[in-house]
UniProtKB/Swiss-Prot annotation:
Membrane topology of the entry: Multi-pass membrane protein
Keywords: Amino-acid transport, Cell inner membrane, Cell membrane, Membrane, Transmembrane, Transmembrane helix, Transport
Stretches that traverse the bilayer: 1-21, 37-57, 67-87, 111-131, 154-174, 179-199
Source organism of this protein record: Pectobacterium atrosepticum (strain SCRI 1043 / ATCC BAA-672)
GO cellular component: plasma membrane
Keyword Transmembrane: yes
InterPro entries xref list: Arg_export_ArgO_enterobac, LeuE-type, Lys/arg_exporter
Catalytic activity: L-arginine(in) = L-arginine(out)
Assigned protein family: Belongs to the LysE/ArgO transporter (TC 2.A.75) family.
PANTHER family xrefs: ARGININE EXPORTER PROTEIN ARGO, ARGININE EXPORTER PROTEIN ARGO-RELATED
Subcellular location: Cell inner membrane
Protein name: Arginine exporter protein ArgO
Role description: Involved in the export of arginine. Important to control the intracellular level of arginine and the correct balance between arginine and lysine.
């Protein structure tokens, strides 16, 4: 069972490490040192729910419903374009709000709402958890499938907390106008690239 658990850890890490809306949001909250551990926890718990749904049967629903898959794709493209546009606006703005009073006025509930949108409207989350993990998990027996799911959840929890803590630790170097412009420009380009790739895949 440990081999199955390790397989889940490695596969979960491989899918969660690339930059996406979730990672970008956790990183930015870590840099601001604003509810970053709460955000990491909520992202990890959301992933746990999605992983469980995908591995224990939810993948069949998404694979069999072309209408649902199309709705997820269209919503995901729109969200990624909007997320990328916001990052680009920040990258090219004359005055970037760092850890100022205006930034800190964001309420806890607004941050939670943004985190939920970043997670649950991210099409790659469903692709990873429902299609990839669901397909692989279905190959295991019930006991082994639980260990596989636990391994992927371990990777998720470890990564989000490590990212939040590392970003908070590096905040003095990352929370500068120049670095923030570079980070937001890179995030915006990646989000638009993912949106284009997803739109082309959905069109096909």
């Amino acid at each position: 069972m440990w081999a199955v658990y390790l397989q889940g850890v490695l596969l979960g890490a491989a899918m969660i490490l690339p930059l996406g809306p979730q990672n970008a949001f956790v990183m930015n909250q870590g840099i601001r040192r604003q509810y970053h551990l709460m955000v990491a926890l909520l992202c990890a718990v959301s992933d746990m729910v999605l992983i469980s749904a995908g591995i224990f049967g939810g993948s069949a629903l998404l694979n069999q419903s072309s209408l649902l898959l199309g709705a997820v794709t269209c919503g995901g493209v729109a969200f990624l374009l909007w997320f990328g546009w916001g990052a680009m606006k920040t990258a090219f703005s004359k005055n970037i709000a760092l850890t100022s009073a205006d930034v800190m006025k964001q309420s806890r509930w607004r941050i939670i709402a943004t985190m939920l949108a970043v997670t649950w409207l991210n099409p790659h989350v469903y692709l990873d958890t429902f299609v990839v993990l669901g397909s692989l998990g279905s190959q295991f027996a019930d006991d082994a499938r639980r260990w596989f799911a636990l391994g992927t959840m371990t990777a998720s929890f470890t990564w989000f907390f490590a990212l939040a803590l590392l970003a908070a630790w590096l905040a003095p170097w990352l929370n500068t106008p120049r670095v923030q412009r570079v980070i937001n420009f890179f995030v915006g380009m990646v989000m638009w690239g993912i949106a284009l790739q997803l739109a082309r895949h959905g069109w096909q």
